[in-house]
Amino acid sequence: MTIEERLNEIVEKGQGDAIIPFLQGLTQEERKTLVPCLNKLEEHYNKFVQLNENTYGTRGTPEQHRIINLTALVIYSLKEFRKHEWGIYTEQLNELIPWYIPSWIDSFFKEGESREFGGFYGMNYETLMDWIEQGVLTLTPSPQTIAGYLVNYMNNTDFLQKRAITLKEHIWYLFQYDCGQNWTDNRTSGQPYFSFRYFVEHGQLDRMRVLKESLLAVNRNLNKNLSSWFAGMFTALNPSTEEQLTLQPEIFAVLSAPHSRPVNIILGLLKNLCTHPQFQVEEFLSQTSVLFASDVKAIHQNTLAILHKLAKERKEHRDTICCAAAQGLTSQEESTQSKIVKLIQTYGR
């Protein structure tokens, strides 16, 4: 029996236990000679046919597809694999890893990083890290790729402590990319930001860095729900007055965020912080043109509330405060206009 005949027999009879010993016994030259045979098997068993009166599907059984997939990983070049296969099943590659790793696996993985479907069925953070540690993958995945897989474990504090690199490096990638982090709250019994709060409280994540990154994330071109989620993380950690004063540059940067909810969250904090002697009045006043340019009434009202407090407490800044408030006179809201006029009449010269 030729090797072509034996491969056909294994596939036709669904002899799953026989395929790996068969592949292990092939020389490099024999693998190449099997390519035309495998091409025909791919075409035959992947063809959609009518299975019964009301059902259509591929001609091959799940076991036949597994046999073909394993064979493809061993004998195909990257070009041939792309032509015949949509992706790699991680559990199938794991069957081969003890004795064989496709030479092109790094290239295939890298290509997948730039696509919506990464090219691997069943890939997750655990498998990814296992492959890196085993040398299956010799490249370094992009931070966005790592974050995309890690986010699915954000409610498992035990798992997140399994590898030092997870908390030391990888968890910070979640502040940089949209991975649906805000949806993790739905799986933590109403405890928002559970893992972040847990690791901060236990000293395993630097508290000031978490606070700072949550503010920086708001302006990282994320969708409005996720931007609000990060702003909410900052307030959920109950930053002290001293922490807020230290992070004033990052706090003020949020005021120019493209979404209104994070802006209002921060304005709510500033209503209390603005009376502190170390509050950077001039830096805040430089943001008022952006705040009054918003078409959201609540932003105008919150900004005016802060300006009123500042005018009352900081006599040396009253002229500048009144000029800043005057920018809001273009508002279409009569209540906003009247409050501005009252502020100027009260504190202006």
List PLM regions with ranges.
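Non-catalytic protein-protein interaction scaffold segments in large eukaryotic complex-forming proteins
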Residues: 1-199
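Eukaryotic acidic, Ser/Thr-rich intrinsically disordered low-complexity regions
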Residues: 3-5, 322, 326-349
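HEAT/HEAT-like alpha-solenoid repeats
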Residues: 8, 212-220, 249-260, 285-297, ...
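Alpha-helix initiation and capping sites
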Residues: 15-16, 31, 204-208, 223, ...
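Flexible loop/turn segments at the boundaries of HEAT repeats in alpha-solenoid HEAT proteins
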Residues: 203-204, 237-245, 273-281, 310-319, ...
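Residue-level detector of extended alpha-helical repeat arrays and alpha-solenoid scaffolds
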Residues: 227-230, 263, 300, 337
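Hydrophobic residues within the alpha-helices of tandem HEAT/HEAT-like
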Residues: 230-238, 266-275, 292, 304-312, ...
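Amphipathic alpha-helical interface segments within eukaryotic helical scaffold
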Residues: 235-241, 245-278, 285-290
